[in-house]
Amino acid sequence: MENAHTKTVEEVLGHFGVNESTGLSLEQVKKLKERWGSNELPAEEGKTLLELVIEQFEDLLVRILLLAACISFVLAWFEEGEETITAFVEPFVILLILVANAIVGVWQERNAENAIEALKEYEPEMGKVYRQDRKSVQRIKAKDIVPGDIVEIAVGDKVPADIRLTSIKSTTLRVDQSILTGESVSVIKHTDPVPDPRAVNQDKKNMLFSGTNIAAGKAMGVVVATGVNTEIGKIRDEMVATEQERTPLQQKLDEFGEQLSKVISLICIAVWIINIGHFNDPVHGGSWIRGAIYYFKIAVALAVAAIPEGLPAVITTCLALGTRRMAKKNAIVRSLPSVETLGCTSVICSDKTGTLTTNQMSVCRMFILDKVDGDTCSLNEFTITGSTYAPIGEVHKDDKPVKCHQYDGLVELATICALCNDSALDYNEAKGVYEKVGEATETALTCLVEKMNVFDTELKGLSKIERANACNSVIKQLMKKEFTLEFSRDRKSMSVYCTPNKPSRTSMSKMFVKGAPEGVIDRCTHIRVGSTKVPMTAGVKQKIMSVIREWGSGSDTLRCLALATHDNPLRREEMHLKDSANFIKYETNLTFVGCVGMLDPPRIEVASSVKLCRQAGIRVIMITGDNKGTAVAICRRIGIFGQEEDVTAKAFTGREFDELNPSAQRDACLNARCFARVEPSHKSKIVEFLQSFDEITAMTGDGVNDAPALKKAEIGIAMGSGTAVAKTASEMVLADDNFSTIVAAVEEGRAIYNNMKQFIRYLISSNVGEVVCIFLTAALGFPEALIPVQLLWVNLVTDGLPATALGFNPPDLDIMNKPPRNPKEPLISGWLFFRYLAIGCYVGAATVGAAAWWFIAADGGPRVSFYQLSHFLQCKEDNPDFEGVDCAIFESPYPMTMALSVLVTIEMCNALNSLSENQSLLRMPPWENIWLVGSICLSMSLHFLILYVEPLPLIFQITPLNVTQWLMVLKISLPVILMDETLKFVARNYLEPGKECVQPAPQSCSLWACTEGVSWPFVLLIVPLVMWVYSTDTNFSDLLWS
């Protein structure tokens, strides 16, 4: 039924043709069941395991690897001789990588689907209905309830469907609907129509929503929606419709894979075409087909060389390390790629309650009457420190601490707060914090009594558990609470009837009253001044109300409660307590004692975090279900708005936002910093608008209602105290529910992205080097310098360790002084592409050069000519060009060992280059990242292992090197550092100056100024080593001459 909240009870019952006392007939139930179906949320049709597995192989990079593995496997099958076993190593290793990758992917996907299933937790199993086949209420399965059923609900029940209340059978009906609306305080319901057809769920006071809990009272109602038509069902549909966006990193890697695949394909085809002339060479037995297959194998080797197989593993490791660091800061990341997405967050949409504020109501101001003279009066105003439930704080008057027992009015005010109260404080030893037991408002009054300590109770030496209610206990020992007149909507107050524990002639029974100021003060005939009772005049009443209005609408927007007493109440026997309509008669002729103002205070650390966000170019938007006045007041206190800033067109209620046309709504999302009184659908709409501006949005939420928006936002952030649905729909969970934790996570995300850029570029330049190496050997006609199994070893192991260690690079000091990076910014810019291409070309040329050195110039080598080396395939005994040359030397393991050793050593030097994008090694020495130094040592140790420990040299087709050969390796490898230092210098001084927020002061050109910040220990270590390496003779010049 549409808009049931706007209809009267009679209209709703008439719509379903049902009587409240008898319920539906079985015939009606059958028809309605056929029309509306079962009252349950349909199970999510998840993808089958096979579909999920196939999905993992849709990535282009993965498909290329798979193709390379299949071709390698086929070629290995037809391999002959000693290489048969080693030929199978390559396809098996690639397949293992792909299987591991698929397992991780499937596991992550499975987790994502659990969010919708978690909604079913909120479906009750049973419901109590009235139907015509029985004369009394009957319990049936909740899924059998249909629209039109008359349902009975009582305290502790879970509401089985969306229900329009028809009658309330207790004084009040309180409902905890926090899972749906995010409201932390239980809501008082009534049966009157709510005329507004566009009312938000918070304002539908005559409706009960499926999945919410009854906190107090008993009532009856008619079911108006079941299953997917309920509010919780609409949330489920929205979640099903929400497609998970790929993170910026995933998009970047997809683009990179696409570019790489095109480049690889072109190079492979080019290598094959270049060598068409060699297909008939004698070494292939003169068979064109065998020649074609041989060069096809080289092209496959090239594909393996070009693909950074270690990249998925290194990225996963880096993100996992990042999540561990974040977990220490109370940010628990559920989805690995979202760690990096945090780094480009440009908007944070945050809930108010519990995230920007403490979610711990606290009294911060109060007043009592000081003097009254006719229509004029003066007030004693006090402020109270402390913003949590901890009973620690002081009462101040004119910024000076006061002793509350010196004011009679404060003693009586504390007595009312302690006795007219059903809540208490409790110390949670496990968490080490004070918590509320009961309602938030009443707990704030309990905490105030502890801070006031009006009877000067000795508190020293008490344990924290005893301290929690020490002062309240003293007051409760003086008077005994006989009964309570519960809160009701008509009088907006509650009261307790108390009698003295030690009866005497002077001490009599009293009623203590608290409630909304306008309701209570209208029923006050007197006011308390000190210990005397003075008649209330119109002037005094006006003065009191003007102060309360100022508190309620000023910069604090406090929630005010008036406190009063009835000094001579009727005796209990004279009261008719069964009918709550009589309660207002007994709460008249009251004496006004004072007023307290409370609020949910902002967290102390939030203001500095909001300031940090502003510095970092991140817009903070508060989105709350609270009213606009309170929301704007909190925004001013934490710095989202300035103290005097005009909030026109910057703060909207959900209703105001809906009334705007689409163009104005876009503008609102572009400029606004506060949305109040919103529904979940508004959150999703705001996220959509922000995404249309290419903003990367982080959205916080804790209720079931927040799940669709959490799923839609790039970064969904659930509260640690939130619902299971919110947590499963989100990418990150805040263990401490604290806004400042989000800002710390954003900072960590930026640092992780910077480090990731470094190791991705490091791995790419390594792969470029390998491609150039294979391309050069093919183009020059040299023997193979590197074989696939060696390339796999380098890509996965020796490169993988330093790449992972680059994830530990220290973050830049000014990381939060820069605006968020553009998510569309390429991973590798034009200049960086040139830079790493240049480095890669050197790596490839040096690797080929090392192999050529052994053939042409090494003392223990064959010393063949360049022509003989480049035409080695024509080597035969009867060829005059190869007279005196043993053709077997072209299959020697030494040149491969030289090439592999140079490749590994250059990569270690390259890892040092990647310590910083543009900072020189002279200013940022290797020990800035001790993990990197350790990983380089480990990688070199592993290289020595495969060189010198049998039978590994046989598997990798290499052989041990002597000292001279190692010196040559160092001579060829070290120039890569000088080369990158030159490129960094160009970038620093000519291409990328001015990217910093703060421009450096101009420096003088003195020698001291130029060497400032240089790490002299590094200089003293490296210079003698380089001089020694290049002073030894290794026939390096012979290679260059040839």
From Swiss-Prot:
Binding site for ATP: T353, E442, R489, K514, R559, T624, G625, D626, R677, K683, N705
One Gene Ontology biological process: autophagosome membrane docking
SMART domains, A to Z: Cation_ATPase_N
Keyword set includes Ion transport: yes
Gene3D superfamilies per record: Calcium-transporting ATPase, cytoplasmic domain N (3.40.1110.10), Calcium-transporting ATPase, cytoplasmic transduction domain A (2.70.150.10), Calcium-transporting ATPase, transmembrane domain (1.20.1110.10), HAD superfamily/HAD-like (3.40.50.1000)
Regulation: Has different conformational states with differential Ca2+ affinity. The E1 conformational state (active form) shows high Ca(2+) affinity, while the E2 state exhibits low Ca(2+) affinity. Binding of ATP allosterically increases its affinity for subsequent binding of Ca2+. Reversibly inhibited by phospholamban (PLN) at low calcium concentrations. PLN inhibits ATP2A2 Ca(2+) affinity by disrupting its allosteric activation by ATP. Inhibited by sarcolipin (SLN) and myoregulin (MRLN). The inhibition is blocked by VMP1.
TM annotation in the entry: 49-69, 90-110, 254-273, 296-313, 757-776, 787-807, 828-850, 897-916, 930-948, 964-984
Xref: Pfam families: Cation_ATPase, Cation_ATPase_C, Cation_ATPase_N, E1-E2_ATPase, Hydrolase
Subunit structure: Interacts with sarcolipin (SLN); the interaction inhibits ATP2A2 Ca(2+) affinity. Interacts with phospholamban (PLN); the interaction inhibits ATP2A2 Ca(2+) affinity. Interacts with myoregulin (MRLN). Interacts with ARLN and ERLN; the interactions inhibit ATP2A2 Ca(2+) affinity. Interacts with SRTIT1/DWORF; the interaction results in activation of ATP2A2. Interacts with the monomeric forms of SLN, PLN, ARLN, ERLN and STRI1/DWORF. Interacts with HAX1. Interacts with S100A8 and S100A9. Interacts with SLC35G1 and STIM1. Interacts with TMEM203. Interacts with TMEM64 and PDIA3.
Protein name: Sarcoplasmic/endoplasmic reticulum calcium ATPase 2
Species for this entry: Oryctolagus cuniculus
